[in-house]
Amino acid sequence: VKRIWQFALLCLLLSALLVSPSFACQSLNRQGVLNLWDTGPLTLDPAISADMSSHIYITQIFSGLVRLDDELNIVPDIAESLPEESPDGKTFTFHLRQGVKFQNGREVKAADFKYSWERACDPATGSTTAATYLGDIVGAEDMLAGRTQGISGVEVLDDYTLRVTIDAPKAYFLDKLAYPTAFVVDRANVESGQYWWRQPDGTGPFKLKEWTPEQRLVLERSQIYYGEPAKLEQIVYLLSGESMGRYEKGETDVTLVSTSYIDEASDEASPLHLQLAITPELSLYYIGFNTAKPPFDDVNIRRAFCLAVDKQHIVKVILRDMVSEADGILPPGMPGYNESVAGLTYDLEKAKELIAASKYKDASNLPPITLTSGGSGNSIPAYLGAIIQDWQQNLGVNVTVRQLEMEDFLYNLNEEKDEMFMLGWIADYPDPHNFLDILFHTGSENNVFEYSSPSLDALLDQAAIEQNRAVRLALYQQAEQMVVDDAPCLPLFHGANYILVKPYVKNYELNTLGIPDLSKVYIENG
């Protein structure tokens, strides 16, 4: 399943909200407490989580051997240092910090990581991310397939030493271990019951204090965290109402900015301007085509649908330049980003020629088409409405939109996939592999397009193990152009985060993956 889900789609849906543009000055904040709005996590199980909203909580409660710092460099976490690497680049030896404890007081040992990773790869766990983030480890694929009971490439040398062997030298392997699937969990906690994750026993800077779904979730500072203690006493998530409205009333301290507020927030004369923070995001928002289902099993139809959408109008007029138009797959700031990629830009004549060249010959011969998106309510985002209108006016094709609650959307995407779907992807680590290989390689868990290209697979496989950085990035640029030309998706735009932060909230920052490090945040009450 995909990484972005709730957070990405939530950001997009917020862009369509219209609310009153008057902000209260008062705050209900008290010292040491950060108040936030959210819809809440789908799960707090690191092995199961595949959505951004859940990740934000999990990264506060759990931790792994390594993590990404603010500049997205890989740094030690529970490991006391970066691992010793063998000359062939395939074996990594980790030395764990001593004294790291789960919330129940038990010390974390190397065997806990072996258990956690093998649990994630156990077919009975049902992880949709283990193959992607742990699959490079020797023996992981065998366990995922049910052929073995353990991962042969993970060896416990002693209580504080773990040796990991991967199938080939890969520059991005350590980055993958910063993903929640590789976080450590307490076996006794997991075996306490099916919904153990509602009372998680983690190793992160915060612990779960209370959780009433659709009402309130509270994180509390861990008193036994091995790193620098969190500055906040509590983080209170309000799981109902509407983000901008709660911010306006002083009930929350941070909010996403909708398009209806961007002019006011960007105006230097506005009091909101000093509360505005903008951070780029390594992301891609797109419409995916089910290439195994008519009519999108025909590349001419896929390309025609791409060419018939006026993305420039959507970005500039509807989304108010809060995002940047996407011609390719890789976002600006990602290694290998190619600003000269030849995208399928707005061209109605070419679109009509492609439909005529397709096996359908004419748009009137296309089967019914449904586009599925995640969300709630009766209205769809304005930008999606504009895309639907472009297809109707420019191609004469009527597309039905089906909007589903997130859990239903995920089920639909994996079990009953419609012809098209609205999605996004936020990077997990700063490497083109995280977009091109994970999304488009044949058989990838996250290849929701049912797309397969042997020539692309060969290029991606070559890039994955190439040790010369310049050559490697050039291979990924070739792969990106192949994907754009074959059009398993319609790239729409690359995102950015526009947030309002109350003046008394300090150090609240989102990295380019869209995740805040809440352990650094503090409240400055006068």
Regions found by a protein language model. Give the residues of each.
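Gly/Pro-rich hinge or "lid" segments in bacterial periplasmic/extracellular proteins
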Residues: 138, 145-152, 159-160, 165-230, ...
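Append "and occasionally in soluble cytosolic enzymes with long acidic Gly/Pro-rich linkers
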Residues: 297-389, 393, 478, 525
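Ligand/substrate-recognition segments at binding pockets and active sites
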Residues: 36, 358-427, 469, 497
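Aromatic- and charge-enriched surface segment that lines or borders ligand/interaction sites
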Residues: 81-132, 163, 246, 295
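Extracellular/periplasmic solute-recognition and catalytic clefts
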Residues: 209-220, 236-293, 316
